[in-house]
């Protein structure tokens, strides 16, 4: 469907449809990594996959792209967990972070010894002064690494 909108491959040409059907939703999830919005997309995809497709209904109109919606939701939730993003607010899934917050009058947080946050960005980064610079840098680096792979 996505490849045919651009151009139908000629005889003896490789059809990139299989590659595109996986890479397009995955790269969408990398760009749109948010757990809440991904869950909404995932639930819409599940609904359209399970809904009866009577002629003239919305489910029949969305039927060609229902699996794309489902996969875009799955990958968006996955990347949202990696980015630790839930409606642009960090999630404290594993209790405290690996940083000790400073006492009054100090601007420097100190790392707890031998502490690694289990998955995703440490939520303390969302309270840092350079939050936007750091988080956008991490997202760009992840997108570049995954895009090259």
Language model regions located:
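Conserved, carboxylate-rich catalytic/transport cores that coordinate ions
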Residues: 1-149
């Amino acid at each position: 469907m996505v490849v045919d909108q651009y151009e139908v491959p000629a005889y003896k040409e490789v059809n990139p449809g299989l590659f595109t059907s996986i890479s397009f939703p995955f790269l969408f999830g990398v760009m749109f990594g948010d757990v809440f919005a991904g869950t909404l997309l995932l639930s819409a995809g599940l609904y359209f996959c399970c809904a009866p497709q009577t002629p003239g209904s919305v489910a029949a109109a969305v039927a060609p792209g229902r699996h794309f919606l489902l996969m875009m939701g799955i990958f968006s939730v996955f990347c949202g967990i990696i980015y630790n993003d839930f409606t642009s607010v960090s999630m404290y899934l594993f209790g405290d972070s690996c940083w000790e917050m400073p006492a009054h009058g100090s601007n420097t947080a100190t790392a707890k010894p031998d502490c690694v946050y289990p998955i995703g960005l440490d939520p303390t980064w969302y309270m840092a002064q350079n939050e936007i610079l750091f988080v956008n840098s991490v997202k760009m680096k992840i997108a570049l690494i995954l895009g090259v792979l």
